Swiss-Prot record:
The gene is queC. One of its GO terms (molecular function) is ATP binding. It comes from Pyrococcus horikoshii (strain ATCC 700860 / DSM 12428 / JCM 9974 / NBRC 100139 / OT-3). Its cofactor is Zn(2+). This is 7-cyano-7-deazaguanine synthase. It comes from the Archaea. ATP binds at residues 8-18.
């Protein structure tokens, strides 16, 4: 039996991975990690929505030390001001790296993968499915092919059963992910990419701020990828 654990953080990338995994695995588990990020309550409700929508079991695990370490590093994902960028600034690599540093959570992806690996090792092995992609790999070193390759080498030694990381979006940018979401029939408007979401609409769609880098990337990817964006924004990003 082919088993996969999807590391689900609520955004376009992990939502695409969830729908993709549903097609490619016999058993799928959603794993959402809480560490006190400002979008945590919205992320959890989004996870619960897709768990019910796709009939996939969900595990939510709290990791308190990541919150403490994020505050030590000054990550804007847990406190402080969320970075705002324009669409044109997304192409300025130094500006993109600057915003990446401001929301960096110390070793987050490595920690999350380790938790998923422990779960899969206990269950007898399987794949950890992550939303790493080409666009974010340009500014986040732990979203790259090289990171996946090295983590998989470490997992050969760190687990008793066969556990590996699979990154189905690694060659795609947000435009490509948008096209994949459409192909998979995903209800992406119920996902959340915003660093500082403003709650939900009456029918359960997250309300995005429309100003943070993640909102701008989301809107650009959807509009340029499939020519539409059903996301609810407080302020629609300008492209």
């Amino acid at each position: 039996m082919k088993r996969g654990v999807v590391l689900f953080s609520g955004g376009l990338d992990s939502t695409a991975c969830l729908y993709w995994a549903k097609r490619h695995y016999d058993e799928v588990i959603m794993l959402t990690i809480n560490y006190g990020s400002r979008e945590e309550s919205v992320m959890n409700k989004v996870a619960e929505f897709f768990s019910k929508e796709l009939k996939i079991p969900l595990k939510i695990i709290r990791v308190n030390f990541l919150n403490e370490f994020s505050k030590l590093s000054g990550s804007a994902l847990v406190e402080g001001n969320v970075p705002r960028v324009s669409a044109s600034e997304l192409e300025v690599i130094e500006r993109a790296k600057e915003t990446a540093r401001s929301v960096w959570v110390p070793a987050r992806n490595l920690v999350l993968i380790s938790i998923a690996a422990s779960l899969l090792d206990a269950l007898g092995g399987g794949d950890i499915i992550v939303g790493f992609n080409k666009e974010e790999g340009e500014t986040f070193p732990d979203n790259t092919k090289e990171f996946v390759e090295r983590v998989n080498k470490a997992l050969e030694y760190a687990t008793m059963n066969k556990v590996r990381v699979v990154a189905p979006l690694i060659e795609l940018d947000k435009r490509g992910i948008a096209r994949l979401l459409k192909e998979l029939g995903a209800k992406y408007e119920y996902s959340n990419s915003c660093y500082d979401p403003k709650g939900f609409t009456e029918d359960g769609k997250p309300i995005h701020c429309g100003r943070c880098e993640s909102c701008v990337r989301r809107h650009r990817g959807l509009m340029e990828g499939i020519g539409e964006d059903k996301t609810v924004y407080l302020v629609t990003p300008k492209l």
